Amino acid sequence: VGAAPLLFAARRLGMAKVAGVSMGVAGRGWEGFAEWLKESFPGVALFSDDGSVGTKGTALDGLPSELPADTEVWACGPQGMLRALAAKYPSDGARVRVALESRMACGMGGCLGCVIPTARGNRRVCVDGPVFTAEEVLWNEFAD
């Protein structure tokens, strides 16, 4: 999935409806992307693993400790980061949307290769997602 659909949605909504963008990258080599982000999303909180692009840290470091009312978080990234995001906002999980990545052999739900555990039973990322609320994913049962 990656960040492209989320950035597209943010641009379409306009910054009047987007409270902020927090982005994490690996480090060197992402300078061009970082410049585009700064131009496209003024005030973007940019983080990198080594501090060479933006501030040293992760995208989670750019988020508030508590979600303001009527605010949603849209996120994509490594499973560990999404798990940490769900843990950061345990009582607001319904307002945290996570775009999950999974190997999808058939892409139509038949092979069950992309199944994840949720509060509503096993769900297929390819046809039931890829976006889920953070509260519905059973992160402790999710294989790394």
Residue spans for each PLM region:
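FNR/FR-type flavoprotein reductase catalytic core
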Residues: 1-101
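Low-complexity, flexible helical/coil segments
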Residues: 31-35, 55-61, 108-114, 131-136
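Local cysteine-cluster metal-coordination motifs and their immediate loop/turn environment
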Residues: 3-8, 79-81, 101-131
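Short microdomains enriched in Cys/His and/or Lys/Arg
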Residues: 127-144
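A generic "cationic amphipathic patch" detector
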Residues: 34, 86, 124-127, 139
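Short secondary-structure transition/capping segments
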Residues: 70, 96, 121-122, 143-144
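Hydrophobic alpha-helical segments
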Residues: 13-16, 34, 115, 121, ...
